[in-house]
Amino acid sequence: MADRPQQLQVHPQRGHGHYEGGIKNQRGGGPSAVKVMAVLAALPVGGTLLALAGLTLAGSVIGLLVTSPLFIIFSPVLVPAAIVVGLAVASFLSSGALGLTGLSSLSWVLNYLRCASQSLPREMDQAKRRMQDMAAFVGQKTREVGQEIQSRAQEGRRT
């Protein structure tokens, strides 16, 4: 590896020397006919939309100027009415939420009881078997202890 000569190749890049601002010069030097037609078509549409936006803004300002005194005059009625409507909507929504919570709780309880009633006979049989096994175990231990007491009593008589 060390005895091989190493070569460096340089490839110059052309055409990327400076930034042109995203505009490429065309052969004709001016905008194309398609671009001119697009601008001419967009000007009336844009102007119309701008005029409609101005009319809408003017109408909104005039409407606000006309209705502001009415809002001030009727505010003793409107504010409590808005509060009542807000409370009614809030109570309706909370009633629905509590109703859904109650239904889901009831569904859970019924499902729990259904599962418990299906497993109850099996659990009762298991408990019965455990009690019988425990009674047999206690009886066996009682016999063993009784025999142990008898054997010790007989040994005590002999001595």
UniProtKB/Swiss-Prot annotation:
It is found in: Lipid droplet; Membrane. GO terms for cellular component: membrane; monolayer-surrounded lipid storage body. The chain crosses the membrane at residues 45-65, 70-90, 92-112. Residues 1-10 have a biased composition (Polar residues). Disulfide bonds: none annotated. Residues 1-24 are annotated as: Disordered. It is a multi-pass membrane protein. Belongs to the oleosin family. May have a structural role to stabilize the lipid body during desiccation of the seed by preventing coalescence of the oil. Probably interacts with both lipid and phospholipid moieties of lipid bodies. May also provide recognition signals for specific lipase anchorage in lipolysis during seedling growth. This is Oleosin Cor a 12. It comes from Corylus avellana.
